[in-house]
């Protein structure tokens, strides 16, 4: 028998789902007999067959009514009441969805639907959505498949659409928003040059502004800019230096409000050898304001050795190549650590490690990265990103039992994951082909290398489903195992695409040719990016981050609803007799973490951890485990407790260098407190609040993200 869902999707009638809904309601009132729930579900199925058997279809509302009737007739009054309340909550969510004016034919969460409407759905002249959620995915799939062979387009369109509707893979935000629209600029990130002359500076400013106009963050290196006070021969004056130039870049970014209500962002890096490096490190204390700039110091292996040896470090004028002064290497690193301890900036990129893995050294050097640091790029290069949702690649396995609170054992569905990766690689390669790049120089560079960045999200969700603690040795082992699998399949698929469609034009002389490949479609294949709003669309945790908190306040139609507790955690607690209660849910919502709640079994507390429950060293080791099997870089925040010291930050930096990371960003809890409002005895940090809904911002993957409304600086 077919079931017609509220979203108009059609599914087969499943007795297990009915039994689960009855048992969850029973658990709300202290019930523990899952066998009774299954027996009642069979009674419901029998009555449905009797009443709807001839028409062979039934709606979810009719199923719910039948469950209520059976529970009441069998005198399970408390369970019936809980079931009715649960149905009412679902009705409220459906009403809120309808009020958004968006047809949800896929079955997204309310929060995901809000994100889709605000950022990705095409709108009419009145600003209202003119496509359904499924229509959006169909639009994207059709546009990306348009570059496939005519006889294969329909096949790939259906595969692309299916994988997005099942929330197995999501392309980057610009691809979702712009595919098949008047603005076919689909790339999220670019890198532009910044030469050391006035004409070149303003040409780069103009070109980067054009990119931002069409949607996309831009990375720069200021390593070629002469230092402040250096001579300018044409005017006999003195140079302003890189820090002053940052203000120019920031102000230009203020002009463009990008598609999807995301203001343009920039990454600025400066080599550790630059004479203005100390001013750069302290630039947020210098009176300047850079809300649209992330900035990082480009660290070399030679500098790390100098720090270890506590030796002097030479600062070199990039214009003349001459040493201008010598400073303490350790003192310089401590200054960077002190500022990061104070407000989270600057980050570090390990430029030698980045260049070591440059796939096309014959084409040019990698000098900087994109907005959030996960994508090293050549000048005038862009990268198209997308992420596989790991949380939906877990399946039941009844061979053994791991934890008593689990619903049965689980394992990674590698067959499904392989299919998702292969389709995702092809989708991103098609993005390169169909994207309209605003600058010819960008189009030429991108088509020469055809770089893509397939990554992952939902890592914390996957670990929970596998009953593995994020901060355990097993999690680190799994991280390497999963990412190696994704990388190997991604490389294999790119090689197959190279044979089918041709290798990237700069293949000759590339690392891939030297490694024995005869064909390779993409100069890079894997990247772990900040998943920003696309993880909210997929209902997944961000990238490889742990859960920021186990409860969030969700926004509904401009107002805040009651806090929402992590659904996997609720299920786990309900499977332990006598633990679940509404009061416990309120306590979890208030604390955000369960580490200190003794009434929750220890095994559950070990598995459901948050970012602040995890040591900085474990964060770095997780970053390194994924970086080992990632072509490009990995974006991840290293969270430190409020009581952490500058020396703790130093240790994190040195550990990241030792473990061959390509970049690192730290955030010490409660460190961003430049703007403080005193309201009675309560202090609130403005910088930590979402600019759209005033909810608390999470710092994840080096990027600010709001779990309440979906706001994100990084798509």
What are these regions, as identified by a protein language model?
Residues 82-96, 299, 356, 362-367, ...:
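Terminal amphipathic helices with adjacent charged low-complexity linkers/tails
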Residues 96-157, 225, 234-248, 258-358, ...:
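Conserved, charged catalytic cores of large soluble enzymes
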Residues 110, 374-376, 428-433, 503, ...:
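Catalytic alpha/beta core of large soluble enzyme barrels
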Residues 141-149, 153, 161-186, 191-234, ...:
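Function-dense linear segments that define catalytic or interfacial modules
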Residues 690-693, 706-709:
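Short cysteine-rich clusters marking metal-coordination/redox-active sites
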Residues 709-715:
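Short Cys/His-rich micro-motifs in 6-15 aa windows
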């Amino acid at each position: 028998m077919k079931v017609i869902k509220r979203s108009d999707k059609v599914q087969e009638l499943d007795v297990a789902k009915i039994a689960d809904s009855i048992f969850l309601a029973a658990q709300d009132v202290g019930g523990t007999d899952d066998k009774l729930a299954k027996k009642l579900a069979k009674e419901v199925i029998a009555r449905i067959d009797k009443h709807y058997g001839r028409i062979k279809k039934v709606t979810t509302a009719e199923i719910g009514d039948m469950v209520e009737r059976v529970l009441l007739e069998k005198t399970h009054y408390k369970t019936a009441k809980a079931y009715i309340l649960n149905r009412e909550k679902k009705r409220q969510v459906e009403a809120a969805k309808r009020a958004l004016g968006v047809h949800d034919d896929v079955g997204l969460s309310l929060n995901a639907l809000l994100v889709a409407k605000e950022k990705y759905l095409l709108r009419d002249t009145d600003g209202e959505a003119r496509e359904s959620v499924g229509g959006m995915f169909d639009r994207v799939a059709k546009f990306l498949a348009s570059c496939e062979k005519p006889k294969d387009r329909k096949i790939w369109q259906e595969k692309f659409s299916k994988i997005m509707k099942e929330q197995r893979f999501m392309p980057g935000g610009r691809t979702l928003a712009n595919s098949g629209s008047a603005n076919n600029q689909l790339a999220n990130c670019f890198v532009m040059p910044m030469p050391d002359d006035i004409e070149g500076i303003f040409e780069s400013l103009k070109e980067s502004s054009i990119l931002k106009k069409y949607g996309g963050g831009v990375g720069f290196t200021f390593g070629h800019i002469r230092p402040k006070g250096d001579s300018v021969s044409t005017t006999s004056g003195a140079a302003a230096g890189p820090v002053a130039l940052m203000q120019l870049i920031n102000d230009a970014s203020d002009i463009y409000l990008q598609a999807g209500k995301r203001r343009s962002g920039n990454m600025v890096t400066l080599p550790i050898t630059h004479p203005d490096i100390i001013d750069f490190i302290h630039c947020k204390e210098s009176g300047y304001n850079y809300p649209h700039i992330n900035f990082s110091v480009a660290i070399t292996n030679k500098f790390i050795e100098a720090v270890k040896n506590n030796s002097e470090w030479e600062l070199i004028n990039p214009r003349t190549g001459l040493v201008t002064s010598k400073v303490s290497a350790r003192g310089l690193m401590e200054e960077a650590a002190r500022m990061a301890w104070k407000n989270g900036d600057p980050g570090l990129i390990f430029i030698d490690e980045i260049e070591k893995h440059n796939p096309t050294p014959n084409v040019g050097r990698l000098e900087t990265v994109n907005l959030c640091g996960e994508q090293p790029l050549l000048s005038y290069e862009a990268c198209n990103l997308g992420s596989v949702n790991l949380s939906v690649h877990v399946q039941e396995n009844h061979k053994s039992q791991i934890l008593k609170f689990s619903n049965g054992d689980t394992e990674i569905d590698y067959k499904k994951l392989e299919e998702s990766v292969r389709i995702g690689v092809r989708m991103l390669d098609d993005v390169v082909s169909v994207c309209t790049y605003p600058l010819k120089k960008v189009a030429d560079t991108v088509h020469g290398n055809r770089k893509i960045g397939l990554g992952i999200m939902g890592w914390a969700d996957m670990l929970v489903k596998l009953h593995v603690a994020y901060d355990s040795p097993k999690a680190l082992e799994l991280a390497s195992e999963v990412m190696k699998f994704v990388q190997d399949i991604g490389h294999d698929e790119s090689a197959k695409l190279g044979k089918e469609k041709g290798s990237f034009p700069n293949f000759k002389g590339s690392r891939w040719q030297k490694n024995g490949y005869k064909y390779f479609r993409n100069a890079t294949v894997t990247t772990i990016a900040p998943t920003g709003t696309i993880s909210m669309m997929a209902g997944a945790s961000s990238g490889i981050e742990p859960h920021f908190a186990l409860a969030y306040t969700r926004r509904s139609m401009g107002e805040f609803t009651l806090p929402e507790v992590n659904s996997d955690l609720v299920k786990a607690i309900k499977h332990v007799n006598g633990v679940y209660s509404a009061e416990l849910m309120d306590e979890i919502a208030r604390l955000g973490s369960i580490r200190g709640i003794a009434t929750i079994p220890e095994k559950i507390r070990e598995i459901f951890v948050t970012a602040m429950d995890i040591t900085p060293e474990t964060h770095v080791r997780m970053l390194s485990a994924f970086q080992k099997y990632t072509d490009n870089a990995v974006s991840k925040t290293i969270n430190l407790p409020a009581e952490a010291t500058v020396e703790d930050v130093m240790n994190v930096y040195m550990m990241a260098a030792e473990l061959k990371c390509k970049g690192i960003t730290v955030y010490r809890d409660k460190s961003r407190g430049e703007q403080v409002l005193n309201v009675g005895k309560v202090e609130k940090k403005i910088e930590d609040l979402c600019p759209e809904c005033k909810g608390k911002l999470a710092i994840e993957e080096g990027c600010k993200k709001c779990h309440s409304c979906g706001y994100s600086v990084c798509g």
